[in-house]
């Protein structure tokens, strides 16, 4: 394979052509994720995969959400064989995540490259981050106008036994595939909104979690389509219903990967001093973090939502942390880990992990204090809290917070940060210039 792939950080020990022969794979989807979380791929016949593993598949980067122009040369997506997954529902095809390269250099703004760079930075400090995610989704009608199950109408539908069994064929098929892939899925449930579901699998190293997260979204959408449905991870697809979160569970392990350095039963909530410093970094950068964990205009309809039909939004709106209490931005459910409840379903799988690690690493290095612990119901008593910062009210506020957070931008890389801010500002400008019926209703006769 040559040394080139080693310097790009891709796996040169696994021969994809041999993988194809052994698994009867006819095609490979060489896939990368752009800055907006869009999954881009080329379908490559197995006969050509050896050349692709050597040289990469060519893409016009400008045609996707990257800060490139038509004048840029081809961007090469070099498959990282360590990520290859044979599609359980279409076994003659395999999916493989790619490393984006241009002019024999890494494309620094590419999300997976950004994550790998941050992971390497943490590893230099002897830290290996392991994470798990809870990617909620709705099963809706093909045209996106309504939930797909006309009988799913309960005002409190969470854990609804009848509703989850009416979608047994879809949920069980996805779970069967995760079992086949060795992900260790351990529970599936109907979530707090009508038509909403969550499926959980075992935590892993941050890059593996991001690759699985990316593939999970592809798989869920594919299986839903197979059953004549549509799956959406949109943060707030229906007014009045609970939105789609993507909660992240975080722990840090030593160089061996066997000792959880966040775990200390002698400390408050079983979270070590290093764990509290990592948490301190999350709290310190929270408002800037939102630009990436909550990356769309619609995201702020979730974290700043009024009371939903079920009685709670299950989303934070203040920068606060607590013990086993789901009304805050961060929950410490038990020793050795914490849950960040801020991210939503639109979060880019790679950037979500990258920004968590970057903020936490800064917290450890600066010995950041997470601040006061709140043990109140923020949904009922949040109005009494006057000393906790509020999360951004909209995407523009979040982008401004991110732009002003110099240390976080540096940690994620100047090229990435500049590209992300530029394209997201364009997205906000497009939204802000959109004329709405609300404006007519409230202004026509003024």
Outline where the language-model segments fall.
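Glycine-rich, acidic/polar active-site loops that bind/position phosphate-bearing ligands
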Residues: 2-446
């Amino acid at each position: 394979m040559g040394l080139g792939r080693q310097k790009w950080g891709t796996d040169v020990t696994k021969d994809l052509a041999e993988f194809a022969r052994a698994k009867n794979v006819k095609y490979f989807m060489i896939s990368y994720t752009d800055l907006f979380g869009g999954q881009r791929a080329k379908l490559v016949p197995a006969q050509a995969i050896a050349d692709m593993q050597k040289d990469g598949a060519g893409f016009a980067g400008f045609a996707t959400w990257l800060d490139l122009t038509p004048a840029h040369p081809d961007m090469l997506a070099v498959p990282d064989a360590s990520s290859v997954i044979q599609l359980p529902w279409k076994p003659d095809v395999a999916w493989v995540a790619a490393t984006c390269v241009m002019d024999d250099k890494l494309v620094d703004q590419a999300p997976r490259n950004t994550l790998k760079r941050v992971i390497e930075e943490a590893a230099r400090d002897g830290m290996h981050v392991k994470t798990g995610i809870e990617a909620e989704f709705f099963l809706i009608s093909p045209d996106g106008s309504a939930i797909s199950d006309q009988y799913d109408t309960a005002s409190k539908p969470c854990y609804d036994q009848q509703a989850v069994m009416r979608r047994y064929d879809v949920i069980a098929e996805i779970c069967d595939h995760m079992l086949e892939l060795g992900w260790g899925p351990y529970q599936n449930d109907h979530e707090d909104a009508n038509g909403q579901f969550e499926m959980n699998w075992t935590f892993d190293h941050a890059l593996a979690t991001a690759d699985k997260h990316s593939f999970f979204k592809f798989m869920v959408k594919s299986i839903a389509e197979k059953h004549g449905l549509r799956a959406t991870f949109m943060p707030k697809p229906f007014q009045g219903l609970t939105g789609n979160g993507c909660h992240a569970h975080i722990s840090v392990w030593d160089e061996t990967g066997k000792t959880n350095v966040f775990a200390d039963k002698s400390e408050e909530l079983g979270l070590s001093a290093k764990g509290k410093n990592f948490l301190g970094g999350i709290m310190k950068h929270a408002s800037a973090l939102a630009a990436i964990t909550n990356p769309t205009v619609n995201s702020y309809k979730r974290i700043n939502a009024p009371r939903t039909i079920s009685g709670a939004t299950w989303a934070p709106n203040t920068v606060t942390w607590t013990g086993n209490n789901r009304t805050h931005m961060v929950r410490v459910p038990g020793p050795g880990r914490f849950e960040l409840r801020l991210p939503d379903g639109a979060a880019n799988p790679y950037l979500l992990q990258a920004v968590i690690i970057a903020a936490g690493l800064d917290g450890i290095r600066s010995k950041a204090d997470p601040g006061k612990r709140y043990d109140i119901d923020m949904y009922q008593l949040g109005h009494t809290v006057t000393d906790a910062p509020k999360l951004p009210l909209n995407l523009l506020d979040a982008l401004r917070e991110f732009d002003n957070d110099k240390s976080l931008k540096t940690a994620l890389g100047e090229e990435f940060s500049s590209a992300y801010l530029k394209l997201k500002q364009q997205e906000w400008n497009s939204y802000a210039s959109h004329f709405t019926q609300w404006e007519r209703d409230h202004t026509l006769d003024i």
